Regions:
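Active-site-proximal alpha-helix that buttresses catalytic centers in soluble enzyme cores
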Residues: 176-247, 344
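GNAT-family acyltransferases
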Residues: 1-95, 160-172
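Conserved acetyl-CoA-binding loop-helix of GNAT-fold acetyltransferases
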Residues: 97-100, 106-119, 123, 142-146, ...
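Domain-level recognition of soluble alpha/beta enzyme cores
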Residues: 329-358
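Phosphate-handling substructures
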Residues: 197, 239-297
Length: 372
């Protein structure tokens, strides 16, 4: 699962119409109620209604987010976050209203979407979040409790339906952990020693982009492969943040054997494709993708355990990073690797709730030809 909360913009009109069309055809109620406003086909009016955040005639200001599945490029649901509670919302409604489109229910989206919504509540300075659901809606209750919800009581709403009131104390829930993986800039491929291979002059110039991308990001720590090209790629950014770079041998690139990189740009049954087809296979003297993945994930899990709620940068390599992405999204394969092989620089942002991946998003890349 790879999701993100987004504000509605004209670029997302197809995703909106797809989701709302399914909901309408199902003859089930739209949820949250905030997305029911007007006819969604009148997009400009619909959007203007969603963008009302100022208090109007006693109306509590709110923020509406749609849940985008980044892998499938579809809306799977939406959340409505009220900035504070009036007397009515304190009884029924709460801070967060949420809903998942009919075809995507019972897949874990609601739990993950609420987790991201809680981070938006944290940004608004809400220390304790109230969520409510109908007593007979077992799925909603489970999603709320999965996010730390504690049942306070049950009340009868204005429709005569029993409703459960849950409180979520954000002080008891660490913020999400954000990891920026930075694949190194272009390196001197003719330099055969993998550990000491430097960046090209162009690669050194490109490395300034890392600091620019992270300029407004409050980074807590920098980690890196011990290989020079990765260290040099994030050095300017670490210096700009006044932080040291902590190296971890497990974050190094795959050990290449005989003709290990043959076939990076070729078709056919090359060593590259054999490795991606069988994570246990490697060329003589080389390292399998399974071994690379195991040590990189081991290092990442330890870093996540020690840095919960923090923002981190990890300097990495093309193959090493690809095995990490494959671990969390097994569909990531050889063609995905070939798509990014020339991206030197390449920055991917992953967010985690503890050890659980919430989102994975490509942030920035520079296309530089891979040197065979």
């Amino acid at each position: 699962m790879n999701i993100k909360l987004v504000k509605l913009t004209p670029a997302y009109r197809p995703q909106l119409e797809d989701m709302m069309g399914e909901w309408l055809a199902s003859e089930q109620s739209f949820s949250p109620c905030a997305i029911r406003k007007n006819d969604y086909h009148d997009f400009d009016r619909y959007l203007s209604q969603l963008e009302r955040t100022k208090e109007e005639s006693g109306r509590v200001p709110d923020s509406v987010f749609f849940c985008l599945d980044l892998d499938r490029d579809i809306f799977v649901g939406a959340v409505n976050i009220r900035h504070y509670l009036n007397e009515d919302l304190l009884q029924c409604g709460g801070h967060i209203g949420d809903g998942i489109r009919p075809s995507e229910r019972r897949k874990g989206y609601a739990t993950a979407m609420i987790r991201l919504a809680l981070e938006e509540c944290r940004k608004l300075g809400i220390p304790k979040v109230l969520m409510t659901c109908d007593k007979d809606n077992v799925g909603s209750a489970k999603s709320i409790m999965n996010n730390g919800g504690v049942l306070e009581n049950e009340v009868i709403n204005e429709d005569g339906v029993w409703e459960q009131r849950y409180w979520i104390d954000l002080e008891r829930i660490p913020p999400v952990t954000t990891v920026y993986f930075v694949r190194h800039c272009q390196s001197e491929f003719s330099h055969r020693d993998d550990r000491t291979r430097p960046l090209t002059a162009l690669g050194m110039e490109d490395s300034a982009a890392v600091a620019q991308v992270l300029h407004e990001t409050a980074v807590d720590a920098f980690y890196c492969s011990p290989y020079r090209r990765s260290l040099d790629t994030i050095a300017k950014a670490a210096q700009a943040h006044g932080l040291p770079i902590q190296t971890d041998e497990r974050l190094r690139e795959r050990q290449s054997g005989e003709d290990g990189n043959f076939g990076l740009k070729d078709d056919g049954d090359t060593p590259l494709r054999k490795r991606w087809r069988d994570f246990g296979w490697c060329e003589p003297g080389g390292e399998s993708l399974g071994a690379v993945q195991e040590r990189n994930i081991q290092a990442l899990r330890e870093i996540l355990s020690e840095s919960r709620g923090k923002t981190l940068v990890i300097g990495t390599h093309g193959t090493a990073l690809s095995t990490v992405l494959n671990y969390y999204r097994p569909s990531f394969g050889c063609e995905d690797f070939l798509r990014i092989v020339d991206w030197m620089l390449y920055i991917v942002r992953l967010t985690f709730d503890g050890q659980r991946l919430l989102t994975s998003e490509e942030i920035f890349h520079i296309d530089r030809p891979y040197q065979k």
